[in-house]
C-alpha cells in the first residue's frame, strides 16, 4: 500500500541537497506535484498540500529535514477529519451500522471483514442480509458469515423494510453487541436506491452509516460517496480493494474532499485484511516508516498469551516440533495476506508488492509440509530427531513426496528451529535489534 506515493515522496526529497536553495525547493515541489497527480490525487487536494508544504518549509528554512517535516505535518492535516477512527460503539448495545455502496464496490465482503474485526474484539455480531437486488448477495453473506463464525439474519419472501425491522428486533432480544446491515447496491445511483436506503435508515435509526468506496474507482468513487452523503447522510468511509493496483490517491484525498473520516481500508482479499485508518499511522507508511502499532494489534488478536509463553519456553530449549510449526502457520494465516503484513514493517514496503500473490493457504510448500506431517506418527511429530532413513522413506511414501523433498523440508525445519532458539537468548535479541537499527539507518531522515 502507498508504495508509489512513498517512492515519489523520496524522489521529491532527493531534489533538495543544500540549505536555503529555493530553486531546489521548486524542483522538489514540482516532483511532488507530479507524484500526486500521477497517483490520482484530486487536483484541489494536490494544490492544497503543495501550498502547505511550501509555506511550512520556507518558514523553518529550506532543507531536507524541513521539507520532510513539512510534508509529514501537511499530510496529517489533509488526512484528518472530524469523527472517529475505526469503529465507534454505542453507549447502549446493539450498535447498529448500515453499510451502503454501489454494486461491485466490495460492500458485502467488507461487511464480513468488519464482522471479523469486531469478533477479534470479543463482540457478538449479527449480520443482516438486506441486499435483495443482487441474486447472489444473500447467499454470499451467508457463506462469509459462516467463515467468520457469526450469525447471519435473512428472510425469504419479505420486503427489505420487514427484514431490517426483524433483524433489529433479533439483535435486541438476543443481546448482540453489533448489528451490521448489508444494504442493496446498484450499478449506478438512482432514486429507487436512495428511497429504499432512506426507508431502511428510518426503520433502523443506525448509529453509523458507512459508505464502502472502491479504491479502483478513483475520483468517481469520491463523487458517489458525496452523493450518498447528501442523500442519506454518511458518518464514515471504508475504502475497499486498496491492494488491487490502486494508486492510493483516493485515500489521500477523500477525507479532505468530503469532510468525512476514512474509517477502514481493505488491504487484501482475505477476511482479516481490514486495517483501521489512523491518520498518524498512514502518514508513517507514506513516509516509509511502516506501521508497527497496527501489526502488533493484528498479532495480538490471534496469539494467546499463554500459548506464546509456552512456545517461547520450547524454543529456548530447542523443543520446537512439527505440530508447533503447523500451528504457527495457521496463526499467521489468520493475520491476513503476507503483502499486507510486510507493508507494515519499516523498510520493507518494497517487498509488499513482490509478495502480493503469496498465499499460505494455497502455497505448494505449505501443502507439502502438511502432507509430510500428516504422514508421521504422533511420536514422530513431537520428536523430529528420531526421523531416521527408514522413517523418512515411509513418510515419503505416505505423503506422495520424494525422499529428497522430505530431507530438504526437515533440514530447513532444523535450521529454523536453531535460529529461533538463538533469537530467544539475550545475544539473539541484541543481534535482532542491531539488524533493525541497520535497516533503519539505510533510509533518509524520518523516511524510516
From Swiss-Prot:
GO terms for molecular function: 7S RNA binding; ATP hydrolysis activity; GTP binding; GTPase activity. GTP binds at residues 101-108, 182-186, 240-243. One of its GO terms (cellular component) is signal recognition particle. The keyword Nucleotide-binding applies. Keywords: Cytoplasm, GTP-binding, Hydrolase, Nucleotide-binding, Ribonucleoprotein, RNA-binding, Signal recognition particle. InterPro entries: AAA+_ATPase, P-loop_NTPase, Signal_recog_part_SRP54_M_sf, Signal_recog_particl_SRP54_hlx, Signal_recog_particle_SRP54_M, SRP, SRP/SRP_N, SRP54. Its EC number is 3.6.5.4. SUPFAM superfamilies: Domain of the SRP/SRP receptor G-proteins, P-loop containing nucleoside triphosphate hydrolases, Signal peptide-binding domain. The keyword Disulfide bond does not apply. It is an enzyme of class 3 (hydrolase). Transmembrane segments: none annotated. One of its GO terms (biological process) is SRP-dependent cotranslational protein targeting to membrane. It catalyses: GTP + H2O = GDP + phosphate + H(+). It is found in: Cytoplasm. SMART domains: AAA, SRP54, SRP54_N. Its main location: cytoplasm. Belongs to the GTP-binding SRP family. SRP54 subfamily. Part of the signal recognition particle protein translocation system, which is composed of SRP and FtsY. SRP is a ribonucleoprotein composed of Ffh and a 4.5S RNA molecule. Composed of three domains: the N-terminal N domain, which is responsible for interactions with the ribosome, the central G domain, which binds GTP, and the C-terminal M domain, which binds the RNA and the signal sequence of the RNC. Involved in targeting and insertion of nascent membrane proteins into the cytoplasmic membrane. Binds to the hydrophobic signal sequence of the ribosome-nascent chain (RNC) as it emerges from the ribosomes. The SRP-RNC complex is then targeted to the cytoplasmic membrane where it interacts with the SRP receptor FtsY. Interaction with FtsY leads to the transfer of the RNC complex to the Sec translocase for insertion into the membrane, the hydrolysis of GTP by both Ffh and FtsY, and the dissociation of the SRP-FtsY complex into the individual components. This is Signal recognition particle protein. It comes from Helicobacter pylori (strain ATCC 700392 / 26695) (Campylobacter pylori).
